[in-house]
């Protein structure tokens, strides 16, 4: 009988231990902390995850570099960070932010809905990391402190903020002859606002929280031509979560995409019309070619993932089969 009591006790201890280990910590990057939109969405996610057997604790922070390092060190079981920062954990999804690769927010939502399919489940896993959701943060636009900077040639010699961990931005700045000023996501807005840089790239979602109207002043403008899509990634250590968690998570995130599309559209619409500067229709093909050449160059250097570049080329040509690039094969990677 004693062995039976011992077995019961051991089973009880094991059950308590399993319960104690069940809580997962997700570290959330939100540039404005607990009052931000990302944190609000993650609170909804936290609630939904209970249905998939996870008991998530959220830790919000405003320093994305620290959050990414904590994730690597195992201090967080999951993270919510930008796609550019997430590229180190999964180059496939981390290449959604490739320059000119997703032409607008509508296409971004279509792509992200497609990626939530079980067909792409294997591509979501990279070593000990799994991407369990990709969300749009919006089109990134160039903001200039002087409307006269209205062509690529006029960007030469100007100071442009580049994220210090994104090689793609440094290379692009060099190609147009601009002076790259190393920055991070927490200070690039302030550098623009206080005149340390002349040009930044940012989504409409950053306009209000970072008070970018201060940097625009009376002479500046937002160039109404998306240069890339900013994305958010949810990434986990899958061994810390229940089996099958990743796919359930991706499907939940997919269901939130129309909501995100509406919110981001409103954020753009809320920016006063006076700040927008249109790009002449005749100039657009030139910009498209410039971004395409840069993208191919960056893919050759291994910065962007070939599988994703091919997929996005296919998506773009499905949207607009008459586009000149659809007759070319240099992004149809084998």
Put a short name on every predicted segment.
Residues 27-107:
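Extracytoplasmic small-molecule ligand-binding "clamshell" domains
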Residues 72, 82-175, 212, 226-333:
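Contiguous mixed-secondary-structure segments that line small-molecule binding/active-site clefts
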Residues 1-8:
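Bacterial N-terminal signal peptides that target proteins for export
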Residues 16-22:
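Sec/Tat signal peptide C-region and signal peptidase I cleavage site
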Residues 9-16:
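Hydrophobic alpha-helical targeting segments used for export or membrane insertion
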Residues 83-93, 189-194, 199-225:
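A ligand-binding cleft/hinge motif common to bilobed small-molecule-binding domains
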Residues 71-81, 178-179, 194-203:
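Alpha-to-beta junction loops
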Residues 23-52, 130-194, 198:
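Bilobed "Venus flytrap"/periplasmic-binding protein-like clamshell domains
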